[in-house]
């Protein structure tokens, strides 16, 4: 049966879903101040490569980051992830690149359906509510938005097309009406996460796979198309009514908006396997082009009470909750920026007061009529961020400038620079995304 929503753009009365999409809206793009000079090429830890390397990028960089499954509010682990790709964008733009950025929303999936049933709410209403909250959180944190923010529901037609291609290429098979992808069809399977077979099986079972299902050719074979079940949303397709598997959703959306090969695939480190491994395998077999992504940039996990923040465990701190308690969004952003994106860390209650104190010092420093030369701090912030997104190092550089500016007071020294406060404010805004407010004209 087709999805029951009369407004669903991916659910016509009959036939395959169309590929003309009704675009989901992202959030506002904050203004980026223009800085003197230009940044340098980005070096970053590439999971598939196994080390930090300088990315070989053209004038236009194609970035894809996996988005939320909207059944709960944005927690700080989510915020830390999307802050990472915000920094990637800022560094690339400062280096003179154009960035084409796509992010999906998994707005139909088992956890969403289960939560909607538990709470007695229509799954579409739940998704809309949480997507709206996510947008508000991203806006408050000044996260640079994607050019295309794409829900799975609106992209079902694209996904059906890719699954059909995989069927035609002999890379798919049926198990009791469900379609599975054969990992044997992907020569490079395993080259993203570099796990051994035993590790793959464990990760597959922990992250949405079904390695123990009878009838599968390989326990690691991922689901492409889930046949219609009673009470679940479904869409028509050449292989029967149903809904997409998780991994192929991103493969199809990325191909439609960015092409067969993208430059950077992003997401939390828990997505490296099986999600990014399988998405790459689907895309490479369907497209006949390898690799799917030239680099994989993964963000470390954030813990609370000794465990990774997890919706299933419930040990979460939400952005919206911090905002409701009166936290300055810029302080929340600073609390996240003080951690390197590749290092797992623990959220504590002390994080916000420390970030608020830092924010106050920076705002006081840029409010002075003059300050130390801006050129060293601008160069250092650029260098730190271009070197594997070293946000803690960039913050330390601004700390040093602010301390020197405040120590000098109103700038009576002959070495003081009238332009420094405004330029440092713009540096922090453009590269770190932290709003320090306007710098008052001299003499006010």
UniProtKB/Swiss-Prot annotation:
Catalytic activity annotation: 1D-myo-inositol 2-amino-2-deoxy-alpha-D-glucopyranoside + L-cysteine + ATP = 1D-myo-inositol 2-(L-cysteinylamino)-2-deoxy-alpha-D-glucopyranoside + AMP + diphosphate + H(+)
Gene Ontology MF annotations: ATP binding; cysteine-glucosaminylinositol ligase activity; cysteine-tRNA ligase activity; zinc ion binding
GO biological process: cysteinyl-tRNA aminoacylation; mycothiol biosynthetic process
Cellular component terms per the entry's GO annotation: cytosol
Motif 'KMSKS' region in this chain: 308-312
EC number: 6.3.1.13
Binding site for L-cysteinyl-5'-AMP: 66-69, 81, 104-106, 246, 268-270, 302
Self-association and partners: Monomer.
Protein family per UniProt: Belongs to the class-I aminoacyl-tRNA synthetase family. MshC subfamily.
Full protein name: L-cysteine:1D-myo-inositol 2-amino-2-deoxy-alpha-D-glucopyranoside ligase
Species this chain originates from: Parafrankia sp. (strain EAN1pec)
Taxonomic path: Bacteria, Bacillati, Actinomycetota, Actinomycetes, Frankiales
């Amino acid at each position: 049966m087709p999805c029951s929503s009369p407004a669903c753009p991916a659910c016509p009365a009959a036939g395959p879903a169309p590929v003309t999409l009704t675009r989901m809206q992202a959030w506002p793009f904050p203004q980026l101040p223009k800085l003197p000079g230009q940044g340098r090429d980005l070096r970053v830890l590439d999971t598939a490569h196994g080390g930090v390397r300088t990315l070989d990028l053209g004038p236009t960089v194609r970035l894809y980051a996996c988005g939320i499954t909207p059944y709960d509010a944005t927690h700080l682990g989510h915020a830390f992830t999307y802050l990472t790709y915000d920094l990637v964008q800022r560094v690339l733009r400062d280096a003179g690149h154009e960035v084409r950025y796509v992010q999906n929303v998994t707005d139909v999936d088992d956890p969403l359906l289960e939560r909607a049933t538990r709470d007695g709410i229509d799954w579409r209403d739940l998704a809309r509510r949480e997507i709206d909250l996510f947008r508000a959180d991203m806006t408050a944190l000044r996260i640079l938005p994607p050019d295309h923010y794409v829900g799975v529901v609106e992209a079902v037609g694209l996904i059906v097309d890719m699954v059909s291609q995989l069927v035609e290429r002999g890379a798919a098979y049926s198990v009791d009406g469900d379609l599975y992808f054969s990992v044997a069809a992907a020569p490079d399977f395993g080259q993203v996460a570099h796990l051994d077979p035993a590790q793959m099986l464990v990760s597959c079972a922990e992250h949405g796979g079904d390695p123990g299902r009878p009838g599968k050719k390989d326990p690691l074979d991922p689901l492409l198309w889930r046949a219609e079940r009673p009470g679940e949303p479904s869409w028509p397709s050449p292989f029967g009514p149903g809904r997409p598997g998780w991994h192929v959703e991103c493969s199809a959306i990325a191909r439609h908006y960015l092409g067969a090969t993208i430059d950077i695939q992003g997401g939390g480190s828990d997505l490296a396997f099986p999600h990014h491994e399988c998405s790459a395998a689907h895309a490479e077999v369907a497209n006949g082009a390898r690799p799917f992504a030239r680099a994989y940039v993964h963000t470390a996990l954030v813990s609370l009470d000794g465990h990774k923040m997890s919706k299933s465990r419930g040990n979460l701190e939400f952005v919206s909750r911090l905002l409701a308690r009166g936290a300055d969004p810029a302080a929340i952003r600073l609390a996240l920026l003080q951690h390197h994106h590749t290092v797992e860390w623990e959220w504590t209650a002390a994080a916000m007061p420390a970030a608020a104190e830092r924010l106050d010092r920076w705002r006081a420093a840029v409010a002075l009529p003059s300050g130390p030369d801006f050129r060293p701090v601008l160069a250092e912030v650029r260098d730190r961020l271009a070197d594997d997104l070293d946000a803690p190092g960039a913050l330390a550089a601004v700390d040093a400038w602010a301390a020197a500016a405040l120590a000098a007071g109103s700038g009576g020294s002959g070495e003081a620079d009238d332009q420094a406060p405004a330029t440092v404010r713009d540096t922090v805004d453009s590269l770190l995304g932290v709003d320090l407010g306007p710098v008052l004209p001299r003499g006010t």
